[in-house]
């Protein structure tokens, strides 16, 4: 299922600026009393495909709202994801750089996690 999520061009932004954009998006659109751990941040090279994988394998996406920023390269995206994890967002498995993202995973995304799949 294709959703055509809007991806903001952040290729000219610094890591700090992108982290601030993501956190500000959380504060303005979400932040209904949940903790940041109720929100998932990740990186991908195909937003529609990754969101479908989350829906099928991980969790529902509340109101199908996903915010995304395209970074200059995978190193920037992975560092943004890492810093968001330090701020308290759920970033998944942290054993690998970019949590398994591939070399062209330049899109950082934010969503509110819904009910876990198979729960």
Please report, for each region that a protein language model flagged, where it lies by residue:
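GIY-YIG nuclease catalytic motif and its immediate N-terminal context
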Residues: 1-91, 95-119
């Amino acid at each position: 299922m294709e959703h055509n999520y809007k991806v903001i061009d952040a290729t000219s932004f610094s890591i700090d600026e992108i982290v601030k954009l993501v956190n500000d998006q959380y504060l303005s659109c979400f932040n209904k009393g949940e903790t940041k751990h109720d929100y998932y941040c990740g990186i991908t090279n195909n937003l529609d495909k990754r969101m479908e994988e989350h829906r099928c394998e991980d969790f529902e996406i509340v109101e199908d709202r996903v915010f995304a920023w395209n970074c200059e390269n995978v190193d920037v995206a992975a560092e943004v994801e890492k810093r968001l994890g330090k701020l308290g967002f759920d970033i998944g498995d942290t054993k690998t750089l970019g949590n398994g993202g591939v070399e062209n995973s330049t899109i950082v995304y934010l969503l509110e996690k819904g009910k876990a799949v198979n729960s």
